[in-house]
């Protein structure tokens, strides 16, 4: 991420990706004003579980972010249709939980034809909605399980939206067990 961009991890865990983003951006600061800008609303996160939420706050504080903006709660609990331009960000870095299932109430936040219990696909939809659009589109680096973009049904419908609307740059597939 570049200085002046807003970075989000919607499932930040203990904040590792956000700490690295902050450290990377801090190296770009050359003036007091730039450091102040970095401290104010540049690094954002959400975490559903209480202990990782507290650890993320502490992790960012220990690495120099004076007022971490980590929100407690599940990022998926906001209906996608309510996410507008003001909620969009420049960069999303995340390793969302996958393999689990979300409670039924969460599914109603997603379009009917894309509702699934597979958490990775829900987070992928959220990420697509939270990224800034043209003229300066946002970027994301997301860890997802093998094959999530190669499934059929809901996965195929999400991919049909992803490919024409976003520039899918790279897919790195790791061998099983890595």
Name each region found by the language model.
Residues 1-91, 99-101, 117, 121, 167-176, ...:
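Conserved S-adenosyl-L-methionine
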Residues 98-108:
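Short, flexible, mixed-charge acidic loops at enzyme active sites
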């Amino acid at each position: 991420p570049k200085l002046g961009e807003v970075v989000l991890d919607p499932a930040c865990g203990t904040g590792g990706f956000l700490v690295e983003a902050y450290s990377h951006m801090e190296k770009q600061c050359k003036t007091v004003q730039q450091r102040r800008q970095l401290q104010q609303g540049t690094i954002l996160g959400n975490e559903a579980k209480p202990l990782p939420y507290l650890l993320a706050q502490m992790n960012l504080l220990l690495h120099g972010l004076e007022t971490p903006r980590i929100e407690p709660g599940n990022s998926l609990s906001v209906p996608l249709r309510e996410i507008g331009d003001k909620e969009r960000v420049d960069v999303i870095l995340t390793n969302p939980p996958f393999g689990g299932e979300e409670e039924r109430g969460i599914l109603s936040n997603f379009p009917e034809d894309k509702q699934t219990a597979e958490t990775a696909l829900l987070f992928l939809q959220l990420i697509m909605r939270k990224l800034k659009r043209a003229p300066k589109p946002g970027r994301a680096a997301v860890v997802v399980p093998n094959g999530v973009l190669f499934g059929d049904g809901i996965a195929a419908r999400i991919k049909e939206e992803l490919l024409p609307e976003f520039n899918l740059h790279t897919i790195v597939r790791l061998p099983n067990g890595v």
